[in-house]
């Protein structure tokens, strides 16, 4: 049996692709070297320890139907579209070495006439007349007996959209997470017009084969049917869940304040693992009872727009005279946490 494995995904679903990556990584023999090539439609991918409400403009993502996907590696937030080519290299230890996979990608780009070099821990850059421009970023994960290196190559990404989804409102919240570093980036297509996703994949594949001195047929992973991978359905369910993508955020606080016709409301939330653990309420409303009840009921609530509105709606039967105010507060909170 060959020590190499080449997988290519036909899916643009980030949860599907990350689930495939996770399953292959868990189940591969320690003697195998794997190359997985894939790409995602409109997605913000965040690091394992990041807070999506801090790193992303979650409201605009929802409006534009952009998905959020939490990966199992560390690092910062990145925006993926079909102008990104994604790669994952996996190997058992002690052979796993991210400098090897970095060299394979650099060699592949060189074959396409793109002179890239490594910069810092995670990036590949190309020198231009305006200075170095980042064309690739990477992240890594290691366990006791294996490791992987995955990253993106900016082929023809819509760079104007980066700031749409990776720049949250300044006053939105204060968090204990990790802040992403946004470098100066460029598309490969601008540096070498005409290069396609298929050419990038072929070049990386050939450089992979050349380094290890053997070849293997590609396995195409299709979204039309779940891959024949043990535990894939469960892994996909977890990868696509709100609990993983949002609920795994580090603890943070969120302060909301608004003035309504009937009075001002200020709410302070402490949030852990996607649930409200503490709520403080301040208001000059002439009838604070329904708002005090709301603050109490929000303890333990999922930090999700529909859940917050649901708590307000449930209080309407107890405070029918303040139904309009409660619904107004519910809509305001829902808008604030999207």
Curated annotation (Swiss-Prot):
Residues at which (R)-lipoate binds: 134
Cellular compartment(s): Cytoplasm
Recorded superkingdom: Bacteria
Keyword annotations: ATP-binding, Cytoplasm, Ligase, Nucleotide-binding
Binding site for ATP: 71, 76-79, 134
Gene Ontology terms: biological process: protein modification process
InterPro entries per UniProt: aa-tRNA-synth_II/BPL/LPL (IPR045864), BPL_LPL_catalytic (IPR004143), Lipoate_ligase_A (IPR023741), Lipoate_protein_ligase_C (IPR019491), LipoylTrfase_LipoateP_Ligase (IPR004562)
GO molecular function: ATP binding; lipoate-protein ligase activity; lipoyltransferase activity
Coiled-coil residues: none
EC nos: 6.3.1.20
Residues annotated as domain BPL/LPL catalytic: 29-216
KW ATP-binding (keyword) present: yes
Gene3D superfamilies linked: Bira Bifunctional Protein, Domain 2, CO dehydrogenase flavoprotein, C-terminal domain
Keyword Thylakoid: no
Listed pathway(s): Protein modification; protein lipoylation via exogenous pathway; protein N(6)-(lipoyl)lysine from lipoate: step 1/2; Protein modification; protein lipoylation via exogenous pathway; protein N(6)-(lipoyl)lysine from lipoate: step 2/2
Database matches in Pfam families: Lip_prot_lig_C, LplA-B_cat
Oligomer and partners: Monomer.
Similarity annotation: Belongs to the LplA family.
Additional detail: In the transfer reaction, the free carboxyl group of lipoic acid is attached via an amide linkage to the epsilon-amino group of a specific lysine residue of lipoyl domains of lipoate-dependent enzymes.
UniProt-recorded name of the protein: Lipoate-protein ligase A
Gene name as annotated: lplA
